[in-house]
Amino acid sequence: MSSYSPLVPPAAGFDADGRFRSVAYGDVYHSLSGALGQAEHVFLRGNGLPQRWRGRQAFTVCETGFGLGLNFLALWDAWRNDPARPRCLHMVSIEAHPFARDALRDWLRQLAPDILQGLAGQLADQWPACLPGLHRLEFEGGAVTLTLAFGAASALAPHLRARVDAYFLDGFAPDRNPELWQPALMRDLARMAAPDATLATWACAGSVRQALRDAGFRVRKQPGYGGKWHMTVGVRESAQPEAPADAWALARAADGEGQDEVVVVGGGLAGAGIAQALALRGRPVCVIDAAGPASAHAGHVAAALTPVIARDDNPRARLSRAGSQRALARWAGLRPGAAPRRCGTLQLERDAGRSAALAETLQQLQFPADWVRAVDRDEAAGLAGVPLARGGVFFADGLLVQPAALIPALLGMPGVRRVAGCAAVLRRVAHGWQVLDDAGQLLGQGATVVLANAFGAQALLRDSGLLDPLPRVAQMHALAGEITLLPGQGLGGGPRCIVGGEGYLLPPVDGWCVAGSTYEHGAATARVGPAGQQTNLGKAAGLLGGLPAAWAALAPGQLPGWAGWRAVLPGRLPAVGPLGHAPGVWLAAGYASRGLSWSALAGDLIAACLHGEPLPLPADLLAAVAPR
């Protein structure tokens, strides 16, 4: 997944016979006899559903070829109508050519059966921007999840992490779209199969059946649907060897039944994101923190969450994109003040040459314009409502967040309890780990402990004898920085959107605009001072093309502000994942300046693993952030 390839939208429409057809592949999306009938006959009954999911806590389906999502809607509808349904239903679906949201909504209004129209509307409401990678959608209060994998199946499938109970193989015909029926893809899909996994497909070509046999499935024909004589069903051969367990699978096993309280050390953005993700799944959480909720962020009036883009769409860019999407999904429903404000971000470059390079990068990446687009100086100023030094790019999903309100909201969820104390050492016991303070007093105990206490995690690991196998974590260091509060009326009320570049300037909160931020290498304390305020005023001037008179008259050292610490790791990526040498211990630290980007994503990543759900990141990104 290291080589980037832009998504190509589908060209589709009705042919002369009234069939919904792909122009590119010259094939129909579903039988003229009806999409719902095909989904029920081929994919549900072909996989023994709903009978097979009864008596289970969760059931996971993997699909090739999402199309308009009619198979997913039929599956979801069957789950809703079954009193003996599993508590959770998960689908992972691969789609190389996703529809844009408006197109998906329009086509579903025409093609989804009346019985599915309500569900189709919910799907369209949550449909993500057409960006490469994984997108997790949640329905029914999180009981039904859909993980969309946008991109080429051959590139995505080796990196998916899930435990699959049933496969819906629904690509276009093998002679029209051979990529979705290649033996290598079948092997990659089979790698995720549970011991009793089944499959079903309308396809019955000999090459398809042989590829499935070679991948470890026992296949047979049975009557097809909509004029097709046969379809193919299969079951995983019991003799199929288990794939080697990776660190994430071992971590899931170490968690046991998945009901015991999880201990989280740290009550900042990292710990709060993990606590929320676990609490939403009904998991009890104990958060150990030396200070009160968000006390470290008292005075941190506002912060920005903006994705990163890179010409090669590198891991940092892909992770930041995933993180911003998870943050918006997770936090949008919080109470006013705690919920982020989707105001957008203008990202300005330092000079005309860099601006041209950024515009060229956008052209190469071909991201949808409703997610990010290039803007000239006049359009940028119009979006911000204030004069700006130059143009740049505009991210529609840029979020303005109030950390001092967000963190207590996340830690205040039902099922989360807080313990005041400073963790000093971890002690291994028979059924997990104990967290002790420096006096040896027990603060918490559990089979699963997550260290989310920023730079403090390094000392905790060292004093527990767990740091030596983690040379990158051993290089983590604390970096001080400060922000400055500027009166919004001095800039005509302040910018309407986030303005970033060499520093940032945020829309006003309670009348104050945040300008930031400084980086104090080697500082002994994090403090607000005249030098830092002068730096932040200079950064604001660089973004605006000069300071307004009211701000130019301000005296550095006399302004309100906030100072704090960043935990920084080499490579500018966080460390998130299980510790292979200490089963049951997890790390979520090194968020640096992007705590908002990693908070919800890391929380969902850890919680999904502990609860046996499909992971919301591909394996190469899991490896990029793995503690080491």
From Swiss-Prot:
The compartments listed are: Cytoplasm
The domain of life for this entry's organism is Bacteria
Q: Which cofactor does it need?
A: FAD
Region feature tRNA (mnm(5)s(2)U34)-methyltransferase, mapped onto this chain: 1-237
Say yes or no: keyword Glycoprotein present.
Answer: no
Region labeled FAD-dependent cmnm(5)s(2)U34 oxidoreductase — which residues?
Answer: 265-628
Pfam families membership: DAO (PF01266), Methyltransf_30 (PF05430)
- Annotated GO CC locations: cytoplasm
Instruction: Give the GO molecular function terms.
Output: flavin adenine dinucleotide binding; oxidoreductase activity, acting on the CH-NH group of donors; tRNA (5-methylaminomethyl-2-thiouridylate)(34)-methyltransferase activity
EC number, UniProt record: 2.1.1.61, 1.5.-.-
Entry keywords, A to Z: Cytoplasm, FAD, Flavoprotein, Methyltransferase, Multifunctional enzyme, Oxidoreductase, S-adenosyl-L-methionine, Transferase, tRNA processing
Reaction(s) the record says it catalyses: 5-aminomethyl-2-thiouridine(34) in tRNA + S-adenosyl-L-methionine = 5-methylaminomethyl-2-thiouridine(34) in tRNA + S-adenosyl-L-homocysteine + H(+)
Task: List this protein's GO terms for biological process.
Answer: methylation; tRNA wobble base modification
What the entry lists under InterPro entries is as follows: FAD-dep_OxRdtase, FAD/NAD-bd_sf, MnmC-like_methylTransf, SAM-dependent_MTases_sf, tRNA_MAMT_biosynth_bifunc_MnmC, tRNA_MNMC2, tRNA_S-uridine_synth_MnmC_C
* Major subcellular site: cytoplasm
Q: Which NCBIfam families match?
A: MnmC_Cterm, tRNA_MNMC2
Entry function: Catalyzes the last two steps in the biosynthesis of 5-methylaminomethyl-2-thiouridine (mnm(5)s(2)U) at the wobble position (U34) in tRNA. Catalyzes the FAD-dependent demodification of cmnm(5)s(2)U34 to nm(5)s(2)U34, followed by the transfer of a methyl group from S-adenosyl-L-methionine to nm(5)s(2)U34, to form mnm(5)s(2)U34.
- Family classification: In the N-terminal section; belongs to the methyltransferase superfamily. tRNA (mnm(5)s(2)U34)-methyltransferase family.
* Record protein name field: tRNA 5-methylaminomethyl-2-thiouridine biosynthesis bifunctional protein MnmC
Q: Which organism is it from?
A: Bordetella petrii (strain ATCC BAA-461 / DSM 12804 / CCUG 43448)
